[in-house]
Curated annotation (Swiss-Prot):
Residues annotated as domain CP-type G: 116-275
Gene Ontology molecular functions: GTP binding; GTPase activity; metal ion binding; rRNA binding
Any one cellular-component term (Gene Ontology): cytoplasm
Lineage of source species: Bacteria, Pseudomonadati, Pseudomonadota, Gammaproteobacteria, Pseudomonadales
GO process terms (BP): ribosomal small subunit biogenesis
Pfam families listed in its UniProt record: RsgA_GTPase (PF03193)
Binding site for Zn(2+): 299, 304, 306, 312
Domain of life: Bacteria
Protein name: Small ribosomal subunit biogenesis GTPase RsgA
Binding site for GTP: 163-166, 217-225
Length: 343
């Protein structure tokens, strides 16, 4: 059944209702901020956003006596959207609460489009994106490549992580080895672990120590189990694979930041089945495929689409085996998913 198209008046009414709801929520929050600021607030200091709950955030103090303590803070109305990993300036209250007064500059941000296609940051100040996949649900190179393009576009180092290595068997071993070989040949760091059995977890901890990392990957690949294995006692809820679809159920609803003993931090974000790249251009996608770098600009035609054009450097590299067919298929699939204006 085709999706019903809304007319202009219906769209206007929906936006009006949503705007009124947002205004009421902002007004309530503004009154709470005014009440706090009218009381006995402490001096301004820096803090770290460790979780976001709509109009409020949890922050961890970074200075003085409050360092390491967690506070639920209100947001001033003029602040930009905050995400887990943001560093902020805040003032503490006397009831375990406080007020965020400013956002500090970000060194990086990981973004993706929301349902309306508008760019939305999901984590800040990340310097390592851990792309998690597993034998089950079946890994798809296209989804892995989407994450790699996103990491390259954001300037964040990627780490490929095959979890549930204990589920490798005769039925999936050949396909998995072929998949991993492609990324190893490209020079991407890759680890194989089993959160369930503990295999490879010490090596993973060493990779995470000293970095601000975020785990990404489709539901069911074991991100929550990895957190439980890395940080005993956190008890992130684990969901089983659906017997009907073979896909995972979402178990983490709010992005949270955790600390590792070695000084590194982990942002555990909600699992997603499809990672959109609507905010990137064709040039961004091409730049996200690292094996293309030395070939771009060498085609016969300046506006080459790398499809069927004669003298295409990428097609010649594909024929010569310097570009894997799997990666070229992913590249074309990602381009086809972009808005027409960017294609």
């Amino acid at each position: 059944m085709a999706k019903r198209q809304l007319n202009r008046r219906q769209n206007w009414r929906i936006e009006k209702i949503q705007g009124e709801r947002a205004a009421r929520a902002a007004k309530r929050e503004s009154r709470a901020v005014e009440a706090l600021e009218g009381g006995d607030l402490g001096p301004e200091q820096t803090g770290l956003v460790i979780a976001h709950f709509g109009v409020q955030v949890e922050i961890e103090g970074l200075q003085g006596e409050l360092a390491g303590q967690v506070f639920r803070c209100h947001l001033r109305a003029n602040l930009p959207a905050l995400v887990t990993g943001d560093q902020v300036v805040w003032r503490p209250g006397n009831q375990g609460d406080g007020v965020i007064v400013a956002q500090l500059p970000r060194s990086s941000e990981l973004c993706r489009p929301d349902m309306r296609g508008q760019l939305k940051p999901v984590a800040a100040n990340v310097d390592q994106i851990v792309i998690v996949f597993a034998p089950l649900p079946e890994p798809h190179a296209n989804l892995i490549d989407r994450y790699l393009v996103a990491a390259e576009h954001a300037g964040i180092r990627p780490l490929l992580l095959l979890n549930k290595a204990d589920l490798i068997d005769e039925q999936n071993q050949v396909a998995l080895e072929a998949l991993l070989k492609v990324y190893r040949q490209l020079g991407y760091p890759l680890l194989e672990v089993s959160a369930h059995q503990g295999d490879g977890m010490e090596q993973l901890k060493k990779r995470l120590d000293g970095h601000v990392s975020v785990f990404v990957g489709q539901s069911g690949v074991g991100k929550s189990s990895l957190v439980n294995g890395l940080l005993p006692g956190v008890d992130t809820r684990v969901g089983a694979l659906s017997e009907l679809t073979g896909k995972g159920t979402h178990t983490t609803t709010t992005a949270r930041l955790f600390h590792f003993p070695g000084g590194g931090q982990l942002i555990d974000s909600p699992g997603i089945r499809e990672f959109g790249l609507g905010h990137v251009s064709r040039d961004d996608v091409e730049a996200g495929f690292i094996e293309f770098h030395d070939l771009l600009g060498r085609c016969r035609f300046r506006d080459c689409k790398h499809d069927r054009e004669p003298g295409c450097a990428l097609l010649q590299a594909l024929e010569d085996g310097r570009i894997q067919a799997q990666r070229m298929a992913s590249y074309r699939h990602i381009l086809a998913s972009l808005p027409e204006d960017d294609y």
